[in-house]
C-alpha cells in the first residue's frame, strides 16, 4: 500500500467518526426548533431521533457481513447518494413520517461509514500503533461534537432553518466521497485476492465476551451519566448555564485525553492500562456523584480525561483477539457499544422518574465498575500479547 493511499484511507476513517459525532451530538441543539417546525412537544419529538440511533445500530450490525459482499468503495459512494436524498428529504418535506425516514437513512449511512472507518484503521495498523491510531480517529467524534453544536447555535441564532445544520454535516460526507477517488481499499470476502493456503477459522475466545460486555456497559454508563448531569446540577442549585458548562468541560477534557493517550498508549500493555483507567474512571465518577458543587468542575474534567481512552482501547483489544483482524469481530464489539447508546433512556428514564437524577448517575457509576471487573478478568484470557509477539517478529 502506497503512503498517499494510506493517508487517504486514514482521513476517511477520521471523517467517518466526525460524521457520526456531528449527527448524534447536534440532536440536543436542534430538537426544540424541529419540534416547533412540526408543532409537536419536545418530549414526543425526541422519540423520532430513536430512528437515527436505530439506523446506526442496524447498519453496524449488518455491515459485518456486507463488507465481504459489497466493496468498501462502492458502499461509501452509495452512502453519498443516500446522504443527498436524506438531507433533501429534511429540506423539502413537512411530513413527520418522511422526517423519521430521513433520520433512519442518516443513521444507516453514519453506521456503515463508521464501521468501515474502524475496520480500515484495524487493517492498516498493528499492535500498539493500532490503539493510538484508533484513539486519534475517535477524537474526531468529540471534535465534531464540539464544532457542530457551535455551527448549529450560529445558524439558529440568525433564524436560519434547522435543516441547514444537517446540510453542513453533509459536507463531511462530501469530503469522504471526494477521497474515495484514486484510492484503493482493502478487498474482503469474495473480492479478496485468492490464495492457495486455506483460510484458518479462528475462534474468538471468551475475551471477546468480556470486551463486548465492557463496551455495552461503558457507553450506557457514559451516556447515562452525561445525559443527566445538567438535571442533577440544577437540582443542587446551579444555573442552567453552569450545568451546560459541566457537559462542555467533560467533552473538551475527553478530546484532550484522546490526543494525549494516542501518544501514551504506545508505551503500555493495553489490557493493563485499560484496567487502571476503568478503575480510575469509576472512582472519579463516584467523587463527582457524592461531591459538593464546588468540586464538580474539577472531578468532571478529570473524569473526561481519564475515561477518554477506554472505549477505543476496548475495540483495539477486540481486534487483537485474533491473529488477523476480523471485521465481524470488530463490528460485534461496536454493535454492543451501540446497543448501549440505544438503551440510554430506556434504562435511565424510569430510574430518574422514580428516584431522581442522582440515582441515574449512581447507576452509571455501577456500570463503570462492571467495566473495571470485565477489564480485570480479561487479563487472564486475552490473546493480544501472543498476537502482538507474532506480528513484531
Curated annotation (Swiss-Prot):
Query: Could you tell me where this protein is found in the cell?
Result: Cell inner membrane
Keyword annotations from UniProtKB, A to Z: Cell inner membrane, Cell membrane, Membrane, Transmembrane, Transmembrane helix
Where does it sit, as one GO cellular component term? plasma membrane
Give the main localization category. Answer: membrane
PROSITE patterns per record = MFS
InterPro entries, alphabetized = MFS (IPR011701), MFS_dom (IPR020846), MFS_trans_sf (IPR036259), MFS_TsgA (IPR023528), MFS_TsgA-like (IPR050375)
Gene3D superfamilies in alphabetical order: MFS general substrate transporter like domains (1.20.1250.20)
Residues in the Cytoplasmic compartment per record: 1-10, 72-77, 122-133, 183-205, 266-272, 318-331, 382-393
List all topological domains (Periplasmic). Answer: 32-50, 99-100, 155-161, 227-244, 294-296, 353-360
Which segments cross the bilayer? 11-31, 51-71, 78-98, 101-121, 134-154, 162-182, 206-226, 245-265, 273-293, 297-317, 332-352, 361-381
Q: Which domain of life is it from?
A: Bacteria
Give the way it sits in the membrane. Answer: Multi-pass membrane protein
Q: GO MF terms on file?
A: transmembrane transporter activity
Q: List the PANTHER family hit by this protein, alphabetically.
A: L-FUCOSE-PROTON SYMPORTER (PTHR43702), PROTEIN TSGA (PTHR43702:SF3)
The entry's family comment says: Belongs to the major facilitator superfamily. TsgA family.
- Name of the protein in its database record: Protein TsgA
